[in-house]
Structures are given as C-alpha cells and as structure tokens.
Amino acid sequence: MVYLATDKQTYADLSITETANNEQFLFSLFSKTETKEGKALMLNWLMYPLSDLEEIRKRQEAIVWDALPELLLNEEELDFIEYYLAYRDQIREAHILLSCATVIDRLVRYDSTRYVICRGVKLVVHLLHCLKEWATELPQGAPQLMKESAAMIGNILHGSELEEVLEQTSDEEKRLSNFVIDKFDYLFRCTRLLSLKELLSVIYLLDVCRTAHRVA
C-alpha cells in the first residue's frame, strides 16, 4: 500500500491525537471499537493515511456498507485467543501415548496451563467456523474490501490443515479428546500461527469498519 507522508505538525493540525485546547481530538471520535486490536488498527489508519485513491475508495465503500455484520466473536473471546496464541508454555507435538497417560492426572489436578490450551483450542475452532461461514455467505454485491477478505480466508483454509480441523469439528458441540486437543494446539500455536493471525485481522477490519460506519 502507498501511504501519505505526514509529520508531527500534520497530526497536530488535524487534531488526530491531541489538541491544544483540550478539545475532542479526532482519534477519540473513532476509538469506540469493540476490540483492543481494532482500536490499534483504527489508530494506524488515522496515523498513516493512504495516498492510493483505489485503496481509499475500497475503505470508503466498506465503511458505508449497510450490511456490515456483527463481530463474529466478542471482545473477551478475542482477547483470550490472542493470549492463547501468544502463550509459549508446553508447545509440543501431539503423541497419543502421552495424551492418554496424562488423562487421569488432568482429571484430579487443576492445571491452569491446560485450561488455557483447552479453551484456546475451542475458541480458535469456533473462530474458524465463523470465518468460513461469513466468507461463504458474503453477498455478491459486497464491497471489494470485504470480498478480498473473504478470498483471503478461502485461500488460507483451502487444502490446509485448518480445513481438516473444520471437517473434524463439523459438530462443534462434540467433545474433543485430549489427543485431538494436543494435535490442534500444536497446529494453532506453532505450525499455522501466522495464518491464524491473518484470519484474526479480518475480525479487526470488520471492527474498524463498523465503528467508522457508526461514527460517520
């Protein structure tokens, strides 16, 4: 993307991050995002404006679109996913014997690390299903920016281990075995970590567009 060159004086003149008279600065008008990462993306949009007219038009179309969906997960769930993916404890490849051997120990002894892993895996699985459904059901007349996001989701999922996760968890209510949780955990926090970060960026893009739509 091509960005417009700006400096501190430009930010001050536009009252993007502060004002001299304690007036409401521009970012405060748009900081009503529902997620922390959405807020960071909104600030990035304001601090680094685009100069490419085509990219600007894409953003404008997305912001004024009346069919912007509700966020696919709530703030607490998204925060937990971010925490889980950044969690570096006990990242190891799944082994069925080890998974079976630790079943009883996990039943009788509370393990905070195991809680993070189990809940994190279930939330990521839910995220994958939500994103696939959103991308699949996106209206044909949706803005180009939304279409590009849906295409990115499809490209990441198609033929990948993440698509296999979707197939294996078609019934989200079905309880996952310890071995499956261990297998998915290694996939999410190691093998396909960057892919999941890209998928999460779609949620934050929706958050920014929804917020700008409300304020505008």
Describe each PLM feature range.
Residues 1-216:
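Conserved amphipathic alpha-helical "coupling/scaffold" segments
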